[in-house]
């Protein structure tokens, strides 16, 4: 594609820019044009797409089939004309392609190569029928080997499903949640009769409440069908007729676990963060999703305060259902066995004994004369004390039981609950803890946002920002008095913050005619808008990195095509010139460096989309 096309896509929106490049990389130029057009126009049918893109209907149909199969498009049948289907963008499939490398890397490290192979096949095909996948192990093997290999694969599928990494694909997954909601709402409203004693506002509210219950029941029914499991020869396994797809929400929960663990590591320490990671893993599968169907329906929940209250209510429900509640024994199951945690928490008794020994070194070697005339060292003598401490240490090391380990882990949990200003866990009852995901997600965003401001705009801008957040609405003079800086310095730092879209100006008129001479300006900070602005910047940077990789690959297309030839692949040292080898190594290094930048930027994107 020419540069004019990318300039137009770049100007449309950062998300369109990234998704267009992702679709082009995996599915080709036609798919990229379709994604760009649908993001710009909302939803269209095939004829409308052809008119806007000037593409042939045949090529559009073939690209749409691939996009739907990879969960990159929704479709919806027209109620008035059943032969017409409308298509819109499904971000789930595009995000899965963006995360695909990290997904496979995590599955390989956490489970193994066989599990990663299954996940890779599911991502490549979008979804697959379980029986079709297992049928490949029924061909050229002996009966016993064939049965055992198929049984092992069935166990892997069952494990991945129970852990939440794969889910059942239903017909509703191909429809946008807003289309399902509107259909349910229209049917519910039609069946809700009008009454002279009931206002129209109350009637709409009642219909909306009933529709919410119907929607949640419908989604829950598709998650847990009646024919989910079958029992064969005493083994419980998944029904081979099920169609499975990858569950992106599960990987997003894992990314949240990593981010919260790193936050605990920076605030408290390494060993405590390992304890916290084990606690997060114990409730990871049952933890709240990063998004909810009600939040994806336009107009249902709009106000950021209402969104926060809704997420708090979901978290309260999960806590009441014990889905995000854990104990020390739950942490023990996920805690690394080889990690030595002895003496990792300093108690008051250990502090006191250490201070008593080292408080006065002169008196520790003082000698007194006994009745029999012999001298006695009041410090106990070096040899006697060391021998006693050595014996105690050997005894403690030899009998460090699971109860001792659980006791130390519980001390770390109490440190997470009340050791810092950030409360990482709540002790809801003696020995039972819950994790406040909503509050911690906000803390995580604030921590990284302030770190970015401090690293890019330096310390003085960071101080000014903290002051503005504390004062909520402030002028330059009040900021200067609070942060102990000159007004000129504050003015420069505020300008840099405004330029970086960190804070915004609010005009305060002093007269009715809003005369400029009688107007003064205050500075304020709005958290929600700042995070949204930063997300757009991160997405744009990710797209620019992908575009950069494509550019230098196109510049060296002849060399790369030569390296991909069958006779050259694997024999590059013999078939390529020295200059070509040098260029090839340079391209590989550039690609690795750009991928590292992409992953770092994407990790920040993960944090601010929690």
Swiss-Prot record:
PANTHER family: DNA-DIRECTED RNA POLYMERASE III SUBUNIT RPC3 (PTHR12949:SF0), RNA POLYMERASE III DNA DIRECTED -RELATED (PTHR12949). This is DNA-directed RNA polymerase III subunit RPC3. Component of the RNA polymerase III (Pol III) complex consisting of 17 subunits. Residues 538-559 are annotated as: Leucine-zipper. It is found in: Nucleus. DNA-dependent RNA polymerase catalyzes the transcription of DNA into RNA using the four ribonucleoside triphosphates as substrates. Specific core component of RNA polymerase III which synthesizes small RNAs, such as 5S rRNA and tRNAs. The keyword Nucleus applies. The gene is RPC82. One of its GO terms (biological process) is tRNA transcription by RNA polymerase III. It comes from Lodderomyces elongisporus (strain ATCC 11503 / CBS 2605 / JCM 1781 / NBRC 1676 / NRRL YB-4239). GO terms for cellular component: RNA polymerase III complex.
């Amino acid at each position: 594609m020419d540069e004019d096309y990318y300039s137009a896509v770049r100007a449309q929106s950062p998300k369109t820019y990234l998704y267009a490049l992702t679709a082009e990389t995996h599915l080709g130029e036609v798919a990229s044009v379709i994604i760009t057009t649908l993001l710009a126009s909302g939803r269209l049918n095939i004829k409308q797409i052809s008119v806007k893109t000037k593409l042939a209907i045949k090529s559009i149909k073939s690209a749409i089939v691939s996009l739907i199969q990879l969960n990159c498009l929704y479709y919806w049948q027209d109620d008035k004309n059943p032969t017409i289907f409308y298509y819109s963008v499904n971000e789930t499939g595009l995000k899965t392609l963006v995360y695909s490398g990290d997904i496979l890397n995590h599955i390989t490290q956490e489970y193994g190569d066989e599990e990663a192979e299954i996940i890779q096949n599911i991502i490549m095909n979008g979804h697959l029928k379980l029986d079709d996948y297992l049928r490949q192990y029924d061909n050229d093997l002996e009966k016993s080997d064939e049965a055992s290999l198929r049984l092992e694969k069935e166990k892997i599928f069952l494990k991945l499903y129970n852990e939440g990494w794969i889910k059942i694909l239903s017909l509703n997954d191909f429809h946008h949640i807003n289309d399902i909601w509107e259909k349910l709402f229209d049917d519910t409203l039609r069946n809700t009769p009008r009454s002279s004693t009931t206002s129209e506002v109350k009637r709409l509210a009642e219909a909306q409440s009933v529709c919410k219950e119907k929607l949640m029941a419908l989604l829950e029914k598709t998650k847990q069908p009646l024919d989910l499991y079958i029992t064969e020869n005493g083994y419980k396994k998944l029904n081979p007729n099920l169609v499975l797809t990858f569950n992106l929400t599960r990987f997003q929960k894992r990314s949240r676990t990593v981010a919260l663990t790193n936050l605990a590591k920076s605030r408290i320490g390494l060993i405590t963060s390992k304890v916290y990671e084990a606690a997060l893993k114990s409730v990871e599968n049952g933890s709240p999703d990063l998004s909810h169907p009600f939040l994806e329906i336009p107009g249902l929940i709009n106000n950021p305060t209402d969104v926060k209250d809704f997420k708090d209510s979901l978290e309260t429900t999960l806590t009441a259902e014990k889905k995000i509640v854990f104990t020390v024994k739950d942490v023990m199951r996920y805690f690394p066995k080889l990690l030595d945690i002895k003496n990792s928490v300093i108690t008051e008794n250990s502090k006191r004994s250490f201070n008593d020994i080292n408080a006065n070194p002169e008196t520790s070697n003082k000698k007194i004369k006994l009745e029999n005339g012999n001298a006695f060292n009041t410090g106990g003598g070096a040899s006697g004390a060391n021998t006693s401490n050595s014996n105690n240490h050997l005894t403690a090391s030899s009998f460090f039981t699971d109860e001792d380990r659980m006791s130390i882990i519980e001390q770390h949990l109490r440190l997470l609950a009340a050791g810092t200003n950030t409360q990482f866990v709540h002790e809801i009852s003696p020995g039972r803890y819950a994790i406040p995901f909503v509050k911690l997600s906000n803390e995580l965003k604030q921590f990284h946002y302030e770190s970015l401001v401090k690293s890019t705009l330096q310390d003085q801008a960071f101080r000014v920002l903290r002051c503005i957040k504390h004062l909520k609405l402030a002028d330059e003079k009040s900021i200067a008095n609070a942060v102990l800086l000159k007004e000129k310095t504050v003015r420069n730092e505020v300008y840099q913050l405004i330029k970086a879209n960190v804070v915004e100006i609010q005009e305060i008129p002093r007269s009715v005619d809003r005369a400029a001479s009688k107007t003064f300006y205050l500075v304020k900070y709005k958290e929600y808008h700042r995070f949204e602005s930063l997300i757009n910047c991160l997405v744009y940077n990710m797209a620019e990195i992908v575009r950069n990789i494509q550019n230098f690959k196109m510049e060296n297309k002849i060399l790369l095509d030569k390296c991909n030839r069958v006779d050259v692949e694997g024999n590059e040292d013999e078939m390529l010139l020295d200059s070509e080898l040098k260029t090839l190594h340079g391209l590989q290094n550039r690609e690795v460096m750009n991928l590292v930048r992409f992953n770092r930027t994407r990790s920040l994107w993960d944090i601010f989309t929690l």
